[in-house]
Regions:
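Active-site neighborhood of HAD-like aspartate-dependent phosphohydrolases
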Residues: 1-53
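Short hydrophobic segments within beta-strands
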Residues: 6, 92-94, 140, 160
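Short, basic/glycine-rich phosphate-binding loops at helix/coil junctions
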Residues: 45-62, 87
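Substrate-recognition element of Asp-dependent hydrolases with the DxDx(T/V) motif
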Residues: 65-70, 75-107
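Anion (oxyanion) recognition and catalysis
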Residues: 80-83, 111, 151-152
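Short phosphate-binding/catalytic loops that engage adenosine nucleotides
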Residues: 87, 115, 155
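Substrate-recognition "cap/lid" segment bordering the active-site pocket of phosphatases
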Residues: 94-138, 143-148
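Acidic, Mg2+-coordinating phosphoryl-transfer loop and its flanking beta/alpha structural elements
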Residues: 136-167
Length: 167
């Protein structure tokens, strides 16, 4: 089976790290003035930041957040089990689109843990076309909209939902 896998929020806990650091940035640096939706876990939807504030947050914190993120619980064991069962594991991720260094950080984390994948698609804006091209049987992603778009191509998806997200 060909299995497509996202990185952030699926393999690495970077989404939680981003949310925590964004809360601190908003509270400490922006004086807690920019919250649009308190119960919204996605940084891009939670805050009413200006374009400049978004860029400042990205410039200051994206790389550090990426470095301090950890593997999700049991993900290494599951990935190794899938590999041993003969499945093809294909990374399909947006990582590296905004900050190129984030790709190298993920590659280093994978190498350190001995995690190998059959193919890598970095900096992807949309994932559905790659899933079709690679004949993906199942795509694992934490973005609900990605799952819907991929499912429209008659590809099974596993929505790896963070407990804080309501979709």
């Amino acid at each position: 089976m060909n299995i497509g896998i996202d990185i952030d929020g699926v393999i690495l806990d970077s989404e939680k790290v981003f949310r925590t650091v964004a809360d601190l940035y908003n509270t400490i640096e922006l004086n807690d003035r920019a919250i649009r939706a308190y119960d919204e876990p996605r940084v891009q939807e939670k805050y009413n930041w200006t374009d400049e504030e978004i860029q400042e947050f990205a410039d200051k914190y994206f790389i550090e957040c990426s470095k301090i993120s950890n593997f999700m619980p049991c993900v290494k064991e599951v990935l190794n089990m899938l590999k041993q069962e003969g499945h093809n594991l294909i990374i399909i991720t947006a990582r590296g689109r905004d900050k190129k260094e984030m790709r190298a950080i993920a590659e280093e984390k994978f190498e350190k843990e001995g995690l190998k994948f059959d193919k890598y698609y970095w900096a992807q804006r949309g994932k559905a076309d790659v899933c079709v091209k690679e004949k993906i049987d199942v795509m694992i992603d934490d973005n609900y909209m990605n799952c819907l778009e991929i499912a429209e191509k008659n590809i099974k998806t596993l929505y790896f939902r963070d407990a804080g997200i309501k979709e």
